[in-house]
From Swiss-Prot:
Located on the platform of the 30S subunit, it bridges several disparate RNA helices of the 16S rRNA. Forms part of the Shine-Dalgarno cleft in the 70S ribosome. Residues 1-22 are annotated as: Disordered. Part of the 30S ribosomal subunit. Interacts with proteins S7 and S18. Binds to IF-3. PANTHER family: 40S RIBOSOMAL PROTEIN S14/30S RIBOSOMAL PROTEIN S11 (PTHR11759). Pfam families: Ribosomal_S11. Signal peptide: none annotated. It comes from Salinispora tropica (strain ATCC BAA-916 / DSM 44818 / JCM 13857 / NBRC 105044 / CNB-440). This is Small ribosomal subunit protein uS11. Transmembrane segments: none annotated.
């Protein structure tokens, strides 16, 4: 017999994940110096699945490795393929080390990669960059 809800206790509604049928979409890879985030969206930009190096289980400096980017891209692609995704256009942003690895792992999982675009923002002499590291 299930436990009874206490009087005055808040009832938590759980939203069911609806299964979307999207055959073609976009993969946005944001690769920074510290982390890699992969979002798979439908053509309008609504996120279907996402994963990051931190979400896959890496912490600290290991999040910035190409291997962490590979696992993050695989996780996001698998979840997108459950929703019927077959083909993606890839948009890469940022200077990180996981850019190419993430694209390769999207192909390895079984997604057909169409066009690859670099959408890294370029400043027209905007903010002053951080000082050079002296190691």
């Amino acid at each position: 017999m299930p436990p009874k809800a206490r009087a005055g206790a808040a009832v938590k509604k759980v939203r069911r994940k609806e299964r979307k049928n999207v055959a073609h979409g976009q993969a946005h890879i944001k690769s920074t110096f510290n982390n890699t985030i992969v979002s798979v969206t439908d053509p309008t930009g609504a996120v279907i699945s996402w994963a990051s190096a931190g979400q896959v289980g890496f912490k600290g400096s290991r999040k910035s490795t190409p291997f962490a980017a590979q696992l993050a891209a695989e996780a996001a692609a698998r979840r997108a393929m459950e929703h019927g995704m077959r083909k993606v256009d890839v948009f890469v942003k940022g200077p990180g080390s996981g850019r190419e690895t993430a694209i390769r792992s999207l192909q390895a999982v079984g997604l057909e990669v169409g066009q690859i675009s670099d959408v890294t923002p370029q400043p027209h002499n905007g903010c002053r960059p951080p000082k050079r590291r002296r190691v």
